[in-house]
């Protein structure tokens, strides 16, 4: 039977906002998970106590921004429109139906000029502390990776600019190690006197800069994808809680941004034992830093960067006893020098290579000389190679696609992190931190609610697997090295 409803748009009703929001609504779970009054402690020094006009409640401002990030709303203007019309949003911020919500420019101004990076960091750490108190964090192994965020900048509006070169963070330590190695081999150590007044071309490099957002960087992915972007270098635990994030321009390599991110993780979670990362992080310095601190780097296979149609890299074997490299024809390549980049150079004898039957696929040098380089920290890289074959670390690396990659997928597909409408590194950093704080808060609230409200019939709705096998380190790994080691061809 066809029923036509009568329009009663002008009808007056007495309703309770509390009764209009479902009991299992996500915002109810979030409101019950933590005490938002804690925010007053973070911002009280940013307001005057007895002067000026009354402000919008800072808790309301943070709740509005959390709504934006939790539901992936692209802009604050759109967020305030949704808050004005959505009953659940109004209930969450504590505004009745007949009260006007704050103007979007008020929220934007406060987060741009009043709430600084320290305030955002307090909120981010506060959510993680609440998760740790509930026992939801598992920081025995951390997963590290980076993802790009498209900047609000047109690729066609660009200019070439000379920018100063950034010194490597470990440059001093590497320089000392290089000089120590040269002295052990009877070589004169390098002097840094020549670097006091380097030529201009050595101080700067030419790069493409956006005229719209100069702090973004050109991001390349494959042969065709190219855009101005930022890079969010992120670390998470085995339960996908984001533990730290460091934002850089899109043209900064993952290995370069690793140190600031890892400093943050070590400062807050020094108990971690394993770092799981992809091949971009398998550099001599990162391997040295992780293994040197008593921890383990679990990474993947990397294809050797050797000459095509030449001898395989593993046919050049390093002899640790004699400090030589043995070539495929069983000739010794003797130590020549250690360069400033930290590589030992092993060179063959020209009179031996002239009559070598495989010289054509070994070297193209006009002097009939083969050079093999090996980094002074190569032993740590070989530790990562040995670890790669251990079952426990194989399993950890297999989980990488379910952990850090899942964090990035959720952030982009569900929470609107594929693009940013903010400009400037500071604004984008705060935006990313608040987004990850919202994701952590959503997970914390859901797990906490499921623990208090089990499913009917004794079923388990919680995603925590308390009886899951523990793949922690039962004993420190032992690495065995033979006297003959592969060298880098």
Regions found by a protein language model. Name each.
Residues 89-93:
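Short amphipathic alpha-helical interface patches used for protein-protein assembly/oligomerization
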Residues 48-51, 95, 423-424:
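Short, surface-exposed loop/turn segments at secondary-structure junctions
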Residues 18-21, 53, 224:
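Short secondary-structure boundary/capping segments within folded domains
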Residues 1-28:
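Hydrophobic alpha-helical membrane-insertion signals
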Residues 3, 65, 72-85, 97-489:
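Anion-binding and metal-coordination hotspots
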Residues 23-66, 71-72:
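Basic, short loop/linker segments at the boundary and entry of helix-turn-helix/winged-helix-like folds
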């Amino acid at each position: 039977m066809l029923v036509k409803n009568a329009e009663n748009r002008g009808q007056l009703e007495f309703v309770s906002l509390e009764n209009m929001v479902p009991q299992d609504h996500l915002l109810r779970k979030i409101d019950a998970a933590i005490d938002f009054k804690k925010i007053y402690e973070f911002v009280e020094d940013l307001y005057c106590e007895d002067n000026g006009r009354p402000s919008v409640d800072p808790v309301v401002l943070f709740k509005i921004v959390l709504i934006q990030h939790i539901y992936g709303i692209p802009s604050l203007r759109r967020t305030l429109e949704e808050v004005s019309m959505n009953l659940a949003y109004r209930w969450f911020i504590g505004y009745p139906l007949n009260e006007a919500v704050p103007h979007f420019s008020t929220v934007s101004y406060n987060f741009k000029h009043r709430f600084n990076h320290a305030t955002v960091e307090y909120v981010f750490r506060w959510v993680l502390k609440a998760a740790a108190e509930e026992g939801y964090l598992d920081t025995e192994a951390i997963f590290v990776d980076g993802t790009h965020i498209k900047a609000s900048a047109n690729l066609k509006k660009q200019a070439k600019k000379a920018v100063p070169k950034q010194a490597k963070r470990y440059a001093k330590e590497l320089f000392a190690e290089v000089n120590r190695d040269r002295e052990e081999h009877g070589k004169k150590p390098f002097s840094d006197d020549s670097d006091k007044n380097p030529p201009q071309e050595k101080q700067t490099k030419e790069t493409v800069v956006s005229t719209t957002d100069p702090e973004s960087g050109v991001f390349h992915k494959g042969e065709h994808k190219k855009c101005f972007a930022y890079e969010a270098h992120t670390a998470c635990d085995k339960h996908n809680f984001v533990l730290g994030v460091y934002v850089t321009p899109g043209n900064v390599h993952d290995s370069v941004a690793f140190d600031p991110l890892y400093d943050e993780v070590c400062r807050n979670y020094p108990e971690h034992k394993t770092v799981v990362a992809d091949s971009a992080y398998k550099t001599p310095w990162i391997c040295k830093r992780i293994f040197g601190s008593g921890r383990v780097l679990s990474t993947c296979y990397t294809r050797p960067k050797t000459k095509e149609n030449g001898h395989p890299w593993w046919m050049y074997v390093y002899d640790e006893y004699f400090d030589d490299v043995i070539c495929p024809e069983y000739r010794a390549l003797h130590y020549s020098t250690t360069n400033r980049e930290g590589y030992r150079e092993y060179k063959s004898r020209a009179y031996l290579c002239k009559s070598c039957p495989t010289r054509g696929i070994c070297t193209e040098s006009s002097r009939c000389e083969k050079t093999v380089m090996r980094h002074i920290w190569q032993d740590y890289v070989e530790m990562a190679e040995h670890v790669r074959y251990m079952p426990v670390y194989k399993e950890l690396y297999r989980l990488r696609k379910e952990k850090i990659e899942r964090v990035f997928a959720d952030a982009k597909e569900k929470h609107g992190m594929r693009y940013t409408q903010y400009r400037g590194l500071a604004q984008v950093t705060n935006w990313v931190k608040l987004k990850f704080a919202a994701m952590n808060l959503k997970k914390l609230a859901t797990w906490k609610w499921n623990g208090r409200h089990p499913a009917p019939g004794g079923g388990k709705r919680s995603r925590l697997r308390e009886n899951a096998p523990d793949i922690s380190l039962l004993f420190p790994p032992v690495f065995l090295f033979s006297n003959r080691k592969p060298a880098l061809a």
